[in-house]
Every structure is written in structure tokens, then in C-alpha cells.
Amino acid sequence: LEDEAAEAIVHVSLGDLRKAITALQVAASLSSTVTRDLIYETTATAPPEELHGYLLACKEDGFQPARRRLKGLLDKYGLAGTDMVNQLHRGLGEVAFLDEKQKLAVTEAMAETDFRMVEGGGEALQLDAMTATICSLIGK
């Protein structure tokens, strides 16, 4: 078990020992060396830096690059749309390149997206709308 893998287990388990044990068991069943990347891939969790990268793409690159980055995250980590929104929300407080006002506006956009998806709105369209809104709120 690599040190970074242990930190990843703490991150994905959110203090739930059962989740931590399950994450370790699944990763160990696939490889004799449990790595950070393996933990994130097997728990359908995007690493914090990947989520920050998506928000940075919204800020600096615009809609299409941010949209591609989001799709890549969903595909690579097997995330459902609501999981993506929840993980983004969880990590938003640590995004240094956004001020408090921007974080508030992004939180509102994520909440609206989550609500619409839970109510049955199409995931792809809702995530695109969220990306467009975030780009408008924090973009150059």
C-alpha cells in the first residue's frame, strides 16, 4: 500500500471505515500494489486535482474544452452526473483560484444541476448547462 493510496482511501471513504475497507479490498484484488490511481479508479471518484482542472478549464479555456474535460472525467472514473456534481461541491472550498463570490455562484449552479438531474432531467444536457453556466460565471 503506497502512502498516497492511503491518503486517497481517507479521501474517498469520508471517514466511513466500511467504505475504506471496501476500497482497499477492491484495489488489492486487482493488483498486489495498491496505488492512489487504482483507489480513485475503483471507487468511481475523481482525484481532487482532476476536479480542479475541470474548474480551471471553465475559467481559462471556455466551454468546449471544459466540456471535453468533464466528459473525460465521467468516462475515466465511471461517474454518474450526480456523483460528479457532489464531488465538485465537496472540493470547491479548496479551489484557490476562485473568490468567495464565485464559489457561491458555482454552488448555486451545481445545486440547480443536481436538482434537475434528480427530478429526471437528462444528465448530459444538465451537465453541459452547468458547464456553460460555470464558464459564464468565472470565465475570462
Regions found by a protein language model. Give the residues of each.
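Conserved small helical "lid"/interfacial subdomain of P-loop NTPases
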Residues: 1-5
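C-terminal helical "lid" of AAA+/P-loop NTPase domains
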Residues: 6-12, 18-32, 40, 53-56, ...
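AAA+ P-loop ATPase motor domain of ring mechanoenzymes
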Residues: 36-49
